Each structure stands twice: as structure tokens, then as C-alpha cells.
Amino acid sequence: DDIPDKYQITFTYVSADDDKGTVTGTTSEIATVYEIFRDSETGEITELGPQTPQHPTQPSTVTPKDGYRFEKWQQDDLTFFNSDDELRNSEYLEDQTFIAHFTVRRDLHYEIHYFYEDANGVVTEDTAAAIVSDIGVFGEKILTTTVPKESEFNGKHYVLERIEGADKQIGLDPKENMVNVYYSMDEIGEIDPDEPDNIPDKY
């Protein structure tokens, strides 16, 4: 650009972790920190004006990977910027590297539902026990606690029959972030007809 490098600074943009997000496109830019005066005929530099701090323009493309979001820019001296606009308002006289940090998403929807089947095969959901959340963390298991093998519902004793989605992890599709827990009535037993035996009565 016909300007000596010693009168310019470089802004560089990188990702802290390419597995979480990338910084691509224009990842560096040059800024001139001196006003330069030249001879009108020879073009030689005749005088330098005072140094003027320069603003980064952040021309790069920042792309989070699935399950992550952009969190902040970090400047060399551990100054942080929460957005491109904040970064662009900063100014420097020396080379700088800006590091894009990404964090896992914690705003994902998931649901856990509990169903109870009586002796007649009628299935009823315990809506009061349902868990509906919009603060799911990407990649974490939906079921984080052990499901009890026995449960009481409407004054009756039930035994755990099956769990649909027991090992599911929270993903990006809310329709897939569902776990259904099924209990079956257990009011009678093989040894004592009046005592539950952890075997569904329908069997």
C-alpha cells in the first residue's frame, strides 16, 4: 500500500476453539496510525503527523458450531467485548489479536412426561409432575436423576414399566428432546393378592 509497515498496525481475528465456532473471511486488517505527508513531486514521506489510535472494524465472519453461540471477544490484555459493536468502539496504537469465544447453548427446550396405566389399560398423564424447560444445555442428558421403580398416583400403587428416551441428550430439535416415563398399576401380588410385587398387574 506504499506505506511503511512501521507506521501501521495489524488487527487479527481468531477463534478460541474451532470445534465450537469459526472465524473466517477477512481475518486481519491493516490500519495506519500516523498521518503521513509526502512530497508532491517525489512522493517521498516528508513529515509525520501525531499518532492517532485506530478502531478495529471486525470484518471477519463469526460462525458458531451447532449447539454453541458466540459469547464474547477477548483482546490480548484480557479485555472483553460482548459484541462486534463494543469491539469497534475500542482503539489502539499497536498490533492486536482478538479472540472469539463460544459457549454451549443453555436455552434449549426439553420435556419429561409421566404416564400411569391402570388395570384396564387406560393411560393417564400426571401433568403436575411433568417437566417442561427452556433452559436445557446442549449435549447434556435429559434425564439427570434416577427414575423411581415405584410410584403412587391417585391413591394407587404403580411400578415402572419402561422409559422412552432414557439416554437421550439435549439437541437442537425440541420435538426430539422428549422423555416419556411409563408406570403400570401394581396393586396385587402373586404371593399375597393384597400386596404389590413389582410386577404390573396386567401381567
Segments (PLM) and residue ranges:
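Conserved "repeat-terminator" motif of extracellular CCP/Sushi domains
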Residues: D1-S15, N82-F115, K168-Y203
